[in-house]
């Protein structure tokens, strides 16, 4: 297998459909066109042609599109064959193409990888292709498209350019120490550095929003049996996703619902009631509940308001609170307010949010929805946003740390060499986002998560 091979793959989902597309990219794409179509189509024009087998018989007929490199998606010669979407027809056509020497099936994401390697896309744009396909909401799709069109990359490149100018100024101060003006102490470098830090903070805020849109927030509903966990899941999902009975231990396994609150994706997880298990099945369910709790972004601690007047989670169930991960955010949900007569709404107890509601009637559930949105810092009014991945957030955080350390060197010790090094490292972190500075191992991991025909 070589990166110089001509590659072919089905670009449409497997299964039956009205249209099926095969995509070919590489030096032998021209030969495929001449062999299968009998001619080379006019560049960038749709040509309706028969697709022929080796013996000249017609396998299918459809649209052929020819994109000679470098003016194509991958930067190579690209041929697209758009025929009927039957799996048998597509398989026959694929087998016919693979009889031509030098062709092979593409690896997952290899078309996008070649586009990146041929400078048709930067790495953030290439990742946005997969994110656009996987988008679970309109807002996520729009943000992914913004990233694909270069919105995220433009912000990052602006920061890199600003750091380049700043590094030039700092290096000049280091290389010409005998000048009458002390470049490190004249205030200009500090002002420029503060501007870069402010711009980076703005990008980080948008990236966190973009990460929420892409990854979603994992919220686990946990508590004792019959506290109303499944009723709350149904109320948040807007449908009867979980069976609800008065029998303790009805929920034996983990139930998952994917919902959206004003565009923010949430993974809501209902778990088995936590208690001493009465049988092996319940014990396994409780173990799985704890596994989900340990991986959660937030826990909704469900409390049956008819069983206790306590509002402090440490007082309600100290053993449960003691077992939770130290930094895991908790929201105490006092359920059955329709029975207890408690005032609906949200308050705070010892640093924990407390919400009183009725999962059965739905009263107070909207307060919980708004709380979940606000607790993750999700802004529904942010326009022109972009999607971001965890690696993007890590790179931005590391760049911010280096800039703060560089500022400390500037203000504390006037150490130009150390400041220059911190600026270089920050620039390197930012360049990792667009792929200007990226290891081959990372590229492999990124593109292997793509669809075969992308």
Swiss-Prot record:
Domain annotation TrmE-type G: ranges: 216-377
Q: Where does Mg(2+) bind?
A: 230, 251
Q: Where in the cell is it found?
A: Cytoplasm
What are the binding positions for K(+) in this chain? 226, 245, 247, 250
An example of a Gene Ontology cellular component annotation for this protein is: cytosol
What's the name of the protein?
tRNA modification GTPase MnmE
State the free-text cofactor note.
Answer: Binds 1 potassium ion per subunit.
**Where is GTP bound in this sequence?**
226-231, 245-251, 270-273, 335-338, 358-360
BP GO terms, sorted: tRNA methylation; tRNA wobble uridine modification
Q: Belongs to which family?
A: Belongs to the TRAFAC class TrmE-Era-EngA-EngB-Septin-like GTPase superfamily. TrmE GTPase family.
Q: Which gene encodes it?
A: mnmE
Where this protein primarily resides, as one coarse class?
A: cytoplasm
Query: Which residues are noted in the entry as (6S)-5-formyl-5,6,7,8-tetrahydrofolate-binding?
Result: 23, 80, 120, 454
Q: What is its EC number?
A: 3.6.-.-
């Amino acid at each position: 297998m070589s990166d110089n091979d001509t590659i072919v793959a089905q670009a449409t989902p497997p299964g039956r459909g009205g249209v099926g597309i095969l995509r070919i990219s590489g030096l032998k794409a021209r030969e495929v066109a001449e062999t299968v179509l009998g001619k080379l189509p006019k560049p960038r024009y749709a040509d309706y042609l028969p697709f022929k087998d080796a013996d000249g018989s017609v396998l299918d007929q459809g649209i052929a599109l020819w994109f000679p490199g470098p003016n194509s998606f991958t930067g190579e010669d690209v041929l697209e064959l758009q025929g009927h979407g039957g799996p048998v027809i597509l398989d026959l056509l694929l087998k016919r193409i693979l009889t031509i020497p030098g062709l092979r099936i593409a690896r997952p994401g290899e078309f996008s990888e070649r586009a990146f390697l041929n400078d048709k896309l930067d790495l953030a744009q290439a990742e946005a292709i997969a994110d656009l396909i996987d988008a679970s909401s309109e807002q996520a799709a729009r943000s992914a498209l913004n990233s694909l069109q270069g919105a995220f990359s433009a912000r990052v490149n602006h920061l890199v350019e600003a750091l380049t100018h700043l590094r030039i100024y700092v290096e000049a101060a280091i290389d010409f120490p005998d000048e009458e003006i002390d470049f490190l102490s004249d205030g200009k470098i500090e002002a420029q550095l503060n501007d870069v830090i402010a711009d980076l903070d703005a990008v980080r805020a948008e990236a966190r929003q973009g990460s929420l849109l892409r990854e979603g927030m994992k919220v686990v509903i946990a508590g004792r049996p019959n506290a109303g966990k499944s009723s709350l899941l149904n109320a948040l999902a807007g449908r009867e996703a979980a069976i609800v009975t008065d029998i303790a231990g009805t929920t034996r396994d983990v139930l998952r619902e994917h919902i959206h609150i004003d565009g923010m994706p949430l993974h809501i997880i209902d778990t088995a009631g936590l208690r001493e298990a009465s049988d092996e099945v319940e014990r396994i369910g409780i173990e799985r509940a704890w596994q989900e709790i340990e991986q959660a972004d937030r826990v909704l601690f469900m409390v049956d308001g008819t069983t206790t007047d306590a509002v402090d989670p440490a007082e309600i169930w100290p053993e449960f609170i003691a077992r939770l991960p130290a930094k895991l955010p908790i929201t105490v949900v006092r359920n059955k307010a329709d029975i207890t007569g408690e005032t609906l709404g949200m308050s705070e107890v010892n640093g924990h949010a407390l919400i009183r509601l009725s999962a059965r009637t739905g009263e107070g559930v909207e307060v919980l929805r708004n709380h979940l949105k606000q607790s993750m810092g999700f802004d529904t009014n942010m326009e022109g946003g972009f999607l971001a991945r965890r690696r993007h957030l890590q790179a931005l955080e590391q760049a911010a740390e280096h800039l703060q350390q560089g500022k400390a060197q500037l203000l504390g010790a006037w150490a130009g060499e150390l400041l220059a090094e911190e600026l270089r490292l920050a620039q390197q972190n930012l360049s990792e986002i667009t792929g200007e500075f990226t290891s081959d191992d990372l590229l492999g991991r990124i593109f292997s998560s793509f669809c075969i025909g992308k």
